[in-house]
Structure formats: C-alpha cells, structure tokens
C-alpha cells in the first residue's frame, strides 16, 4: 500500500511516498486524523539534535481500519491515540501497547505528550510513594506543558499540598499560582523534576538525603562536583517512552483527559490542514509567536 509521509531532508520536512507493509497479527492499521507537532520533530529543522530515521510523528489520533487476528481490544472503526513513530503517514501500522482506545476523535486525545509527563511519576512509582509520604518539598524546574501536567496530577490525583511544590519558570501562572517562582528557591528537596536541561540539581546543593532526581530534559555536558551528591544516596532516573511502564501512563493520560482532571485544549493553539497548510505547522512552530503553544496537523 503506497502511503504519503513526511521525511526530513537537509533538515526540512519534505513529502514523499513509501510502501507500507500489511499488518501482522499483533498489529492494527490506523488512518491518521490528527498529529501533534512536537518539539523533537521541530528539532529536525532546527538541527539541534541528531535524529534517527523513522523517529518522528508519534503524537497521533486516528481511526482503526484493519485489525490483526490476535487483537481483541479494538475493532475497525474505533478511535485510538497512538505513540507509533509513523512519519506523519496517511496510514500506518501500530503494535499492541502502542495505542489506547479513546472515546472520540479529537485533538484533545493527542495523548503521547501527556503520557510522557505522567511517566515521570509512573516510572518512579515506588520511590515517589516512599518519599511523598514524608511530605517533603517537591521541585519542578520548568513551567511549560509537562510541568502543567505534573502539577495538576500531583495536586488533584495524589493530594499533594501546593505549598510543598516549587515550580521555577515564567509560564502558566494561572495553573501554578503561588507555587511559581522566577528564580530557584534554595531548599533541600525530596523530589526534583528537571525539565529545563540546565543540570541545576547537579550544580547546586538542593538535593536532600535519599532524594529522587528525575531528569526529563537533556542538558549540555557539565562538570559536576560529586561532593554535592556524596553520601546522600540520591536516586537519579531518566524516564523514557521505551520503558515498560509507559503503556500504563498512556492509559492514565486517556483517563485524566476524559474525566477532565487535565484539560489539554489551551496547549493546542492551532490545527493545520494536511494537504494545504502542513508546512505552516512546522514553520510557525519553529518561530513560536507570542501566545503560541503547540500546533497539530489535520487529515481529512
């Protein structure tokens, strides 16, 4: 089956065609309806990070068009949110645990970025529960989309007192309220989510004994004085969608959107038509004008 897709050539996405194979018995075929344009994909054009082939276009919503013989959780015509790296294809194949059934076909259910946010906790669940019982301080470095999901889930799902949470950044004041700080409050923190990639927790004495450091953004190489970490028994974790807990996070993402615990609408600024406006989704996403968050591409 010949299928259109986007391919990065000389750090610009170009439209081309490939031969999509038929599904295996543990796969479904999906017709694309919405795809979020992620920061990772924009880095193809920025040329800020090396990009592996076939590793983009993974924030998707679509309609099931074929079902493998061993698939029992969805049927043809169902709507799904997927995490498959499908190259912005018109149709693509999706493996078990790379999709979840969703109640309606809407960009609200572009779940992959929400699942990535939840996975910061899910992948570290046992350690998180242990430290959260102590009711110590929690630091979130960054105030964008991921931080918003984290803060909402911490306060609404895990009943964390907002007074225990310190968010460093300058965005989404209406979400963080008094928890938002422009500069780093110097305390000893039990749990730190580093979403900025500045290596701040490794170059400042802010980690408590037996603390948990979750690194959610890659930083530049930095010389670190290990005396800051010595004898503190710090657990450092690098969450990833490749972790076996990610499917759990994907299901949780569907639940918190469906129950309106978290509302993603304000973060999707604009949709662009696949056939006539797709280049604008990338060019505007790169330039990121004021009050612009994220764009997505709409298939007919």
Residue ranges with predicted function:
Residues 115, 144-149:
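Residue-level detector of alpha-helix initiation sites
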Residues 79-141:
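NAD(P)H dinucleotide-binding glycine-rich loop of Rossmann-like/cofactor-binding domains
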Residues 19-36, 46-86:
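Glycine-rich beta-strand-centered segment in the early N-terminal region that forms part
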Residues 77, 89, 188-190:
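Local beta-strand N-terminus motif with an aromatic residue
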Residues 134-143, 151-202:
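Adenosine-nucleotide cofactor-binding segment
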Residues 247-300:
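C-terminal hydrophobic helical "lid"/dimerization subdomain
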Residues 199-259, 298-300:
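Glycine-rich phosphate-binding loop and adjacent beta-alpha segment
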Residues 36, 68, 196-197, 217-218:
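Short glycine-/small-residue-rich Rossmann-like dinucleotide-binding loops
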């Amino acid at each position: 089956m010949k299928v259109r897709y986007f391919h990065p050539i000389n750090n610009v996405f170009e439209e081309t065609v490939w031969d999509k194979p038929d599904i295996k018995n543990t796969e479904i075929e999906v017709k694309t309806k919405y795809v979020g344009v992620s920061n990772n994909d924009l880095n193809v054009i920025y040329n800020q990070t090396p990009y592996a082939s076939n590793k983009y276009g993974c924030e998707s919503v679509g309609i099931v068009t074929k079902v493998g013989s061993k698939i029992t959780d969805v049927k043809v015509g169902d709507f799904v949110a997927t995490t498959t790296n499908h190259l912005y294809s018109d149709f693509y194949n999706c493996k078990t645990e790379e999709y979840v059934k969703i109640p309606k076909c809407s960009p609200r259910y572009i779940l992959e970025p929400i699942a990535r946010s939840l996975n910061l906790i899910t992948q570290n669940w046992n350690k998180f529960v242990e430290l959260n019982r102590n009711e110590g301080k929690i630091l979130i470095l960054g105030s964008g989309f991921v931080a918003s999901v984290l803060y909402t889930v911490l306060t609404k799902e895990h009943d964390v007192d907002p007074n225990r949470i310190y968010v460093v950044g300058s965005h989404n004041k209406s979400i963080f309220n008094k928890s938002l700080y422009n500069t780093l409050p110097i305390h000893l923190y039990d749990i730190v989510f580093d979403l900025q990639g500045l290596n701040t927790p490794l170059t400042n004495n802010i980690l408590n004994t037996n603390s948990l450091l979750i690194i959610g953004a890659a930083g530049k190489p930095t010389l670190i004085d290990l005396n800051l970490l010595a004898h503190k028994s710090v657990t450092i974790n690098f969450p990833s969608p490749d972790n076996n807990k990610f499917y759990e996070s994907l299901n949780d993402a569907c639940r918190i959107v469906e129950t309106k615990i978290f509302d993603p609408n304000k973060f999707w600024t604009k949709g662009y038509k696949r056939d006539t406006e797709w280049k604008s989704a990338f060019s505007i996403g790169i330039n990121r004008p004021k009050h612009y968050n994220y764009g997505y591409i709409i298939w007919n």
